[in-house]
Amino acid sequence: MVNPGRTARALCLLCLALLLLGQDTHSRKLLLQEKHSHGVGNGTTTTQEPSRENGGSTGSNNNGQLQFDSAKWEEFHTDYIYTQDVKKP
């Protein structure tokens, strides 16, 4: 006999795995679009520095990985910390 609770848990885990795979695929697609657009926004929210192969400088760590504007990420982090402080003083 099939246990309904175990079946429901298995079904939920399967759906969660499919959603995570779909999200990963979507993220990779956005990164590829951003890489092919040579750092121009094209409506996406990532702010990348141009890669060395496109004539730009990626700093000291140039191993082919995408580099992001650290000032923008610091701003996001500061905004997040401020928001958390306001919510839970």
Curated annotation (Swiss-Prot):
It comes from Oryza sativa subsp. japonica. Expressed throughout the seedling. More abundant in fragments containing shoot or root apexes where cells proliferate vigorously. Residues 1-22 form the signal peptide. The gene is PSK1. One of its GO terms (cellular component) is extracellular region. Residues 23-79, 85-89 form a propeptide. This is Phytosulfokines 1. One of its GO terms (molecular function) is growth factor activity. Keywords: Developmental protein, Differentiation, Glycoprotein, Growth factor, Secreted, Signal, Sulfation. Belongs to the phytosulfokine family. One of its GO terms (biological process) is cell differentiation. Glycans are attached at residue 42. It is found in: Secreted. Sulfation is important for activity and for the binding to a putative membrane receptor. The N-terminal tripeptide (YIY) is the active core. Promotes plant cell differentiation, organogenesis and somatic embryogenesis as well as cell proliferation. The keyword Kinase does not apply. Residues 33-70 are annotated as: Disordered. The modification Sulfotyrosine is found at residues 80, 82. Its main location: secreted.
